[in-house]
Amino acid sequence: MLNYTTHLHKDSTTWVTFVHGAGGSSSIWFKQVREFTRHFNVLLLDLRGHGNSKPSLKRVFSEKYDFDSITHDIVEVIDHLKIKKSHFIGISLGTVLIRNLAEKYPHKVESMVMGGAIMKLDVRFKFLMGFGKVFKNIIPYLWLYRFFTFIIMPDSNHRESRSVLVREAKKLYQKEFVKWFRLSSQINPLLRFFRAVDLKIPTLYVMGGEDYLFLPSVKKAVQRQSTSSLLLIEHCGHVVNVEQSKLFNDVVIQYVADMSS
């Protein structure tokens, strides 16, 4: 089972589950924990191979790596804790996992908050993935990861976000990074399906105005989805919860409270 941490509220029955992206860990939510635990029950988890979710030697060779199995990891924790329904907050690739969870287990999802959401891969990102596939077994993964974070978050005000992600990525093993990287071959058809299907689950997209690779497709998706809305944060990059944490916290806490009432 994944490593997880819970923070229980003395009065609230509302659950909020945080899902980080590739290369990160539950530590990426360090600017959210204090504020959210004042209002809700909070579940933080480390995805497979990330943070303190280290696989056993047996599981390293036997685990299946696809979006459904990784999504099931999350559901396993939720079921173990007997959480019937939760609001889900994700960042970057974590938003893809949340969307997949909502597709497979809609009865478990109260609402979705998608920070730095990935809805479509543009030509630039596809080029990056192609470059990575060629060199993933040759170049140290941390070099590749640094390169990726700089392409996605190139501006000077994105520096803290880059540093946080690289710090967490140092905890990954090379083999784990390669397995997660292989997921890229599955993501395009999955995203295409997500764009075509409106789940009608309340969804708030929180995007930085400088999230150059992913913002355009999210804007189009919001126009097509009947229960979706977009918070656009100007002068902000991909990792909105780190770069503009106060605005992120204020808006998302209010959103979750509204969706819970």
Indicate where each model-derived feature is located.
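Conserved alpha/beta-hydrolase catalytic His-Asp/Glu region
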Residues: V123-F125, L142-V197
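Active-site loop/oxyanion-hole signature of alpha/beta-hydrolase fold enzymes
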Residues: R34, L43-I89, D250
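Catalytic active-site module of serine/aspartate enzymes centered on a nucleophile-bearing elbow/loop
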Residues: S228-S261
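Alpha/beta-hydrolase fold catalytic core
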Residues: M1-T17, R38-N41, D79, K84, ...
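Flexible "cap/lid" loop of the alpha/beta hydrolase fold
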Residues: E103, V109-I139
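Conserved loop-alpha-helix segment in the C-terminal half of the alpha/beta-hydrolase fold
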Residues: P202-C236, V242
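Gly/Ala-rich beta-loop-alpha elbow adjacent to hydrolase catalytic centers
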Residues: G90-G94, I98
